[in-house]
Amino acid sequence: FEVTEKMIRHFVQKVHNNRKTLVRPRVLIAVPSGITQVEKRAVRDSAESAGAREVFLIEEPMAAAIGVDLPVQEPTGNMIIDIGGGTTEVAIISMSGIVFSRSIRIAGDEMNEAIVNYIKKKYNLLIGERTAEDVKIEIGSAYPMKKRMTMEVKGRDLVAGIPKTLIISDEEIREALTETFGTIVEAVKIALERTPPELAADIVDKGVVVAGGGSLIKGLDILLKEATGLPITLAEDPLSAVALGAGKV
């Protein structure tokens, strides 16, 4: 609660150029679709304690869909996958409402943790989360690439207790992330199974849009296309999709 309050207070002060005068803005916060009413209340309370005059919540997949310009108000089916840092949001949207959504706590942070654990288990090398993030961005992939990629990784040898450097490949990182990608694919399949037939027909025609930082993983669109048989489109500005959508509301 306190951490959330401090974060929101920092954002409010930053927007208002750190003015010392009392500013009580209206605040719109994007939250995961799977959080409970208690968690929503906690977010509201944190924002109000940080000085917000009014607090509005919008579910992240809806914000992402608006941010990538999906026709959410039309009576047709739209599917959005938002792979963020803490959660992956999968949603079917129609007529300004979420018909079905699934939120899983498997996303970018989980990928970093999987990379750390894989290298620790295979090489007895302990690397930091920042290094794991760099590895994920540089050579992480969800599908075999045409060109083999490698990267130098530095960490601490857990046996000798001294710094050590090794070379890892994209194939190894793909192996490390297999379970994570599998969980995301399963969530997508469940959403498709729960989609009403008339909306499913729209999604078959229009395909699926993927947003969030996780969508930048190489080959993810190919993996999802093979798993679902649907056209997959990556958002033009995936990192800002939720923020852009919230700004349009």
Question: Predicted segments — roles?
Answer:
Residues 1-83, 91-209, 215-249:
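Nucleotide/phosphate-binding catalytic cleft detector across ATP-hydrolyzing
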